[in-house]
Every structure is written in structure tokens, then in C-alpha cells.
Swiss-Prot record:
This is ATP synthase subunit b, chloroplastic. Belongs to the ATPase B chain family. In plastids the F-type ATPase is also known as CF(1)CF(0). Coiled coil: none annotated. Keywords: ATP synthesis, CF(0), Chloroplast, Hydrogen ion transport, Ion transport, Membrane, Plastid, Thylakoid, Transmembrane, Transmembrane helix, Transport. GO terms for cellular component: chloroplast thylakoid membrane; proton-transporting ATP synthase complex. It comes from Fagopyrum esculentum subsp. ancestrale. The chain crosses the membrane at residues 27-49. Its main location: plastid.
Length: 184
């Protein structure tokens, strides 16, 4: 018991502190001083610390909100880009199909045009052949008539008199003129 009373007695012999200050010697500080310092820190530091945490929380929330807005805008832009891509792909397919159908149509038109040109050339060829045949036939007829006429004239000259000869010539000339009109 003497030790306990000595402790209280020795408390009375402490000198009073001349000023308030911090004791930086951790081993010389007692739990009462530590609890006072910790209490003061908690009391005054709580507001500062909570303000720091609130500011940090607001910055984090704002950053998250901004990130979500940016993400939403990026998603909207992505959807718009995808829609434009689908539209462009559809237009490209349409142009491709129109191009193929136009090529087929041009090919058919070219084939039809060539076919018509060949038909016209065939018709011109047939007309030319027919015309040449008619010309040759007319020339042959004319020569046959000329030879027949010369033969008839030769026979008439040897067999007929002048008067009969003149009548026959006039009749043949009339007949020859009628034949010429028919052939022309």
C-alpha cells in the first residue's frame, strides 16, 4: 500500500507546467495527454475530415456521372454510326443490284440491237440479190429477144416481100415496146 500512497504523494510534488505545449517524447507522454490530444483531434478534425471525404465523394460521384453521360453519348453515337453503316450497306447493295440489272439490260439491248442489225443486213443482202437476179433476168430476156428478133428479121428478110416485111417489123416493134413497158 505504501507504493500506492507514494504515487499520490509524488503527484503532489510535480511542478506545474509553465506553458501549454506538445511533448514530442512519446515515452514521456501519459495516457491522459494522449487522450486529450486524440479527443481534440477527433472533435476539430472530424469536420475537416468529413469535408475532405464529402468533397472527395462529390468529385467521385461527378466523375462517375460524367463518365456515364460520356458513355451514353458514345453509345448513342455508336448506334447512329451503326444505323448509318446499315443504310450505306443497303444503298451499296441497291447500287450493286441496280448495276447488275443495268448491265444485264444493256447486254440484252446490245444483243437485240446486233440481232436487228443482222436482220437488216440480211434483208439488204436479199434485196441486193433479188435486184441483181432481176437485172440479170432482164438482160437475158433482152438478149433472147434481140437474138429472136434478129433471127426473125433474118428469116423475114429472106422469105418475105418488102411490104410484108415492113408490116411484120412494125408489129414486132410494137410488141417489143409493149414488152419493154412490162419489164420496166
Amino acid at each position: 500500500m505504501k507504493n500506492v500512497t507514494d504515487s499520490f504523494v509524488s503527484l503532489g510534488h510535480w511542478r506545474s507546467a509553465g506553458s501549454f505545449g506538445f511533448n514530442t517524447d512519446i515515452f514521456a507522454t501519459n495516457p491522459i495527454n494522449l487522450s486529450v490530444v486524440i479527443g481534440v483531434l477527433i472533435f476539430f478534425g472530424k469536420g475537416v475530415f468529413s469535408d475532405l471525404l464529402d468533397n472527395r465523394k462529390l468529385r467521385i460521384v461527378n466523375t462517375i456521372r460524367n463518365s456515364e453521360e460520356l458513355c451514353g453519348r458514345a453509345v448513342e453515337q455508336l448506334e447512329k454510326a451503326r444505323a448509318r453503316l446499315r443504310k450505306v450497306e443497303m444503298e451499296a447493295d441497291q447500287f450493286r443490284m441496280n448495276g447488275y440489272s443495268e448491265i444485264e439490260r444493256d447486254k440484252l439491248n446490245l444483243i437485240n440491237s446486233i440481232y436487228k442489225t443482222l436482220e437488216q443486213l440480211e434483208n439488204y443482202k436479199n434485196e441486193t440479190i433479188h435486184f441483181e437476179q432481176q437485172r440479170v433476168i432482164n438482160q437475158v430476156r433482152l438478149r433472147v429477144f434481140q437474138q429472136a428478133l434478129q433471127g426473125a428479121l433474118g428469116t423475114l428478110n429472106s422469105c418475105l416481100s418488102n411490104e410484108l416485111h415492113l408490116r411484120t417489123i412494125n408489129a414486132n416493134i410494137g410488141m417489143f415496146g409493149a414488152m419493154k413497158e412490162i419489164t420496166d
